Amino acid sequence: KEKRQEEIDIMGEQDKNTALFAECKWTNEKVDLSILVTLAKHSRLFSYKNIHLYLFSKSGFTKGCIDEANRMGNVTLVSYADIVAYNLM
């Protein structure tokens, strides 16, 4: 494989076949599809069979991002509102 440097905010390995990759955005804009596409692309630089992607956002997600996350099936979207609601439980 080609050697490259890419920024990944969070990476965790469960075992030799499974890992998670995450991107965190603390902005006033919703996270759009391009962020998800970039994270998915960066995760493919590794040879894990099972990849789980997480996007964390202060301001939520665009419809395009939500639709693609649902289509992909291995993506979890977490907004700041989700975190606050979870902490209130």
Task: Give the residues covered by each predicted segment.
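A cross-kingdom feature that marks ATP-driven nucleic-acid transaction machinery
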Residues: K1-M89
